[in-house]
Amino acid sequence: MKHSLRTLWRLRVKINEFNEYIKEARSFDIDRMHGMRQRMRIAMALTVLFGLMTIALALAVAALTPLKTVEPFVIRVDNSTGIIETVSALKETPNDYDEAITRYFASKYVRAREGFQLSEAEHNFRLVSLLSSPEEQSRFAKWYAGNNPESPQNIYQNMIATVTIKSISFLSKDLIQVRYYKTVRELNDKENISHWVSILNFSYINAQISTQDRLINPLGFQVSEYRSDPEVIQ
């Protein structure tokens, strides 16, 4: 009898130990699952946070992109004179187009007035006259006349004077400065280069002119005063 009771007591002890083991195992599994859930919540929160930061960064870059533009340009160097010129693109604004048109007419005017080639003399004289006011036409005609010793007809005769524009600057809305150099090629092919600065007072007028003249000066560009002086190169 005592032996049976002892055996039963030992069996009960083992069952209790087994139950404690099961309880501890379940508690461990529950704690582990709870920890995994916490880590998953933290990982999901970090994922959402990084996602929001990425979206915010992309929006910031997209907002700043229009403010930062790359404008390519070309630098051109004249091999004979060493003059450096920047070739830029034309921007799509009305003021830039207006200035570009004025620069075109100013350079055309200076080339025709200061350059000389006997075969083009008549054409250039007419062009300068069409782009000048009546008062400036009169001054130009007197200066260009054959009885004036300073006339390009008497100075250059059979030589060729070529004008190369270096820069064009707006001093005011109706005053423009043209820097250029003049290359005079003599009959023996010797070349002389001199540097000059021209100042032009200009405006655009709506004058009644012929269809042929309108082809030369379609917008009514007109120079009212003109002067050209040697430029001192240091």
From Swiss-Prot:
<dbReference type="InterPro" id="IPR026264">
    <property type="entry name" value="VirB8/PtlE"/>
</dbReference>
<keyword id="KW-0472">Membrane</keyword>
<comment type="function">
    <text>The type IV secretion system VirB/VirD4 is a major virulence determinant for subversion of human endothelial cell (HEC) function. VirB-dependent changes of HEC include massive cytoskeletal rearrangements, a pro-inflammatory activation by nuclear factor NF-kappa-B, inhibition of early and late events of apoptosis, leading to an increased cell survival, and, at high infection doses, a cytostatic or cytotoxic effect, which interferes with a potent VirB-independent mitogenic activity. These changes of HEC require the T4S coupling protein VirD4 and at least one of the effector proteins BepA-G.</text>
</comment>
<keyword id="KW-0812">Transmembrane</keyword>
<keyword id="KW-0997">Cell inner membrane</keyword>
<dbReference type="GO" id="GO:0030255">
    <property type="term" value="P:protein secretion by the type IV secretion system"/>
</dbReference>
<dbReference type="GO" id="GO:0005886">
    <property type="term" value="C:plasma membrane"/>
</dbReference>
<keyword id="KW-0813">Transport</keyword>
<keyword id="KW-0843">Virulence</keyword>
<dbReference type="InterPro" id="IPR032710">
    <property type="entry name" value="NTF2-like_dom_sf"/>
</dbReference>
<feature type="topological domain" description="Periplasmic">
    <location>
        <begin position="63"/>
        <end position="234"/>
    </location>
</feature>
<feature type="topological domain" description="Cytoplasmic">
    <location>
        <begin position="1"/>
        <end position="41"/>
    </location>
</feature>
<keyword id="KW-1133">Transmembrane helix</keyword>
<dbReference type="InterPro" id="IPR007430">
    <property type="entry name" value="VirB8"/>
</dbReference>
<dbReference type="Pfam" id="PF04335">
    <property type="entry name" value="VirB8"/>
</dbReference>
<keyword id="KW-1003">Cell membrane</keyword>
<feature type="transmembrane region" description="Helical">
    <location>
        <begin position="42"/>
        <end position="62"/>
    </location>
</feature>
<comment type="subunit">
    <text>Interacts with virB9 and virB10.</text>
</comment>
<comment type="similarity">
    <text>Belongs to the virB8 family.</text>
</comment>
<protein>
    <recommendedName>
        <fullName>Type IV secretion system protein virB8</fullName>
    </recommendedName>
</protein>
